[in-house]
């Protein structure tokens, strides 16, 4: 009963926070919101509680385990005994496999398997979310291709997309993650929470956006043609491009981690020193924990653990999900399984401030005017995407 009450409270909080920034409350279609919510709760139960769902998750994680094993073969060849001895563990074991996974995605894209999957799942989503096919295709392609390369598939129509639809596309990209780094997440979190979050975020995105950014799509706007990302390229040209793109992602993540972890350590020391003058000695992350404490509690985290979880939530928002996942690993043994599951689901998304620049830059490279539009609603993007993570984690809490 306590879980149900927490869930109802979480729904109310998410709804109120979404309605506060809604562009047009009169256009909200409650039927689709309820429809999506029911489907999402059922999917959460399926993936986190049912034998069939857990079996699927196990099979999915075992597949990624094998892929990571293949990736290690390449890493071992280049770095040799460093990998076997556990040296530079995070870069070699977590980030380097991104190169191999990226290459696989490129192959599946080149042989036209991924476009078929994107269109099939997108078509089904469009039947239940009350939005257009473009939004539904974009949700699936964002999950597979990532928040920056995803927009290349729509480069020919970006200039024709309305402001409302542009917000939906950008928010969807920020609320999901790229399949190329799912393997990296699975080395840091329990695989079942990663898989559940991938599915839940897709539905939570449409629920939150139905409240924040409601609109109707005209029939004339539905003639969408996705571009072939690598038209005219040979197989090996494409493969080389995806391998280099994967390595670039690994290097960027490594650089971001170095910078953010160092910055947070400096801020922790500064805040501890300043607050120490008043006899408290509270770190920067400790202060953020107090700010996010009520949100963590509303999501269903036990009050005794909400401060720790709130601190990790805030760390993810101001830095990125990798920094937050590393912090979670340090305290995971002190958390209850319920709290660990809730925060794990929350962390699996790109909802943070640095993503504003990534998405705006990607769009601006294809269409400068639309890139400026995305930049202008950057803070609203992070706000909406964070609500998506809160909703997904709250739904997971209901069935954990």
Curated annotation (Swiss-Prot):
Transport is inhibited by the proton uncoupler dinitrophenol. Inhibited by the nucleoside antibiotic showdomycin. Keywords: Cell inner membrane, Cell membrane, Membrane, Symport, Transmembrane, Transmembrane helix, Transport. The chain crosses the membrane at residues 4-24, 37-57, 87-107, 169-189, 193-213, 251-271, 282-302, 342-362, 379-399. Its main location: membrane. It catalyses: adenosine(in) + H(+)(in) = adenosine(out) + H(+)(out); uridine(in) + H(+)(in) = uridine(out) + H(+)(out); thymidine(in) + H(+)(in) = thymidine(out) + H(+)(out); cytidine(in) + H(+)(in) = cytidine(out) + H(+)(out). Residues 25-36, 108-168, 214-250, 303-341, 400 are periplasmic. Signal peptide: none annotated. One of its GO terms (biological process) is nucleoside transmembrane transport. Residues 1-3, 58-86, 190-192, 272-281, 363-378 are cytoplasmic. One of its GO terms (cellular component) is plasma membrane. One of its GO terms (molecular function) is cytidine transmembrane transporter activity. Pfam families: Gate, Nucleos_tra2_C, Nucleos_tra2_N. InterPro entries: C_nuclsd_transpt, C_nuclsd_transpt_met_bac, CNT_C_dom, CNT_N_dom, Gate_dom. It is found in: Cell inner membrane. It is a multi-pass membrane protein. Belongs to the concentrative nucleoside transporter (CNT) (TC 2.A.41) family. Binding of nucleosides to NupC requires the presence of hydroxyl groups at the C-3' position of ribose. Nucleoside transport protein that can transport adenosine, uridine, thymidine, cytidine and deoxycytidine. Shows weak activity with inosine and xanthosine. Transport is driven by a proton motive force. Does not transport guanosine, deoxyguanosine, hypoxanthine or uracil. Also shows activity with the chemotherapeutic drugs 3'-azido-3'-deoxythymidine (AZT), 2',3'- dideoxycytidine (ddC) and 2'-deoxy-2',2'-difluorocytidine (gemcitabine). This is Nucleoside permease NupC. It comes from Escherichia coli (strain K12).
